[in-house]
């Protein structure tokens, strides 16, 4: 930063961006919670078990260990893997139901994003992180990462459309 004023502007911009993101997250989570309550449906047990297993694997990665060693560590602390998975079940079900609702709405509303919209996302990411668009594109050169960005852009487009409809 060249001046204290530049620093202040950047801090204010970052705070506003974080605030806007938090508000959008709260609104979308509230919407999904209401939809789950209004339109209840069951998740197949196999889907729930796959999600819980994925969370267990991720936790093992975070502890930089194997799932088997993680289970031994959990047992040594007086808990069990089964008890831990039970505590995760409610959140896992809500997340899966939310994902199904979002995917269904995106499909039913034929929501797609154009290459121009993805370019705009690259620019927003670059501006928000103080890096170049080329650096952002390099990160998203991996097809999986780019697919995640595209899915996120579709989801944001869905929420924007829904919130415009209910104003």
Functional labels for PLM-detected ranges:
Residues 1-167:
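Extended, charged alpha-helical "arm"/coiled-coil substrate-binding scaffolds
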